[in-house]
Structure formats: structure tokens, C-alpha cells
């Protein structure tokens, strides 16, 4: 059903090429995507990061990101509060997508082969 919802959205908005996405601000794209049943914040953020190549996205709901940032910044075993995670990620603006990639890599022991 979610695939059908996405297809219907594309059809009703006459989305048939990349210019629909690449000529708009990501905040507007994000707001539009999360209105489609089956697409939530995480999916919209991944779309922005990996398809649109947005450089300043920090997926706060990503479990890998939260695990990595807690491994690096957690004190005395107490998980960071979301406000602390936001404050840390704010230091990485406007390149939080790159920071996200490094955080993911920090918890993944497998080499990436290009």
C-alpha cells in the first residue's frame, strides 16, 4: 500500500523528472514527503541525504546515529538526552550529513569497497 501511496503522489503532482526535487528547498521537500502515508521523518531524511545529496541533514531518529554518538560522548553510561545530541550536532553545521556518515562508519567494522 505504501508504494501505491507514493506512486499516487507522484502521479497527482506530475512528478516525472528530477527537476521537481532538485529545484526546491529540502525543508519543503521534507514537509511534502512526510505527508505521504508510509514515509516518515527518517525516510525523508535518507532521501535528502542519499538522493538529493543534501549536506546538512542529521537524522535524530536513526538508531545507528544515536548509538554512535552515545559511544563517543556518553559519560558514566548515562545515555545522552536528545537536547544534548542536538547541541553536539549543531557544531557540525553545515556538514551534518558528513558527520552522520562518519558516525555510522564508527559503529560498522566492515570495510566499504568502492
Residue ranges and their predicted role:
Residues 1-8, 41-48, 82-86, 100-103:
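Short, well-structured alpha-helical segments
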Residues 1-35:
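Alpha-helical ds-nucleic-acid-binding substructure associated with the helix-hairpin-helix region
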Residues 6-10, 36, 72, 92, ...:
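Alpha-helix boundary/capping residues
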Residues 11-15, 52-57, 106-114:
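Short helix-capping/linker segments at secondary-structure and domain boundaries
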Residues 16-17, 71-76:
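Substrate-binding clefts and substrate-entry loops adjacent to catalytic sites
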Residues 21, 25, 35, 39, ...:
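Short amphipathic alpha-helical interaction segments
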Residues 25-71:
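Catalytic DNA-binding helix-loop module of base-excision-repair DNA glycosylases/AP lyases
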Residues 28, 74-114:
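A basic, often C-terminal nucleic-acid-binding module that engages the phosphate backbone, implemented
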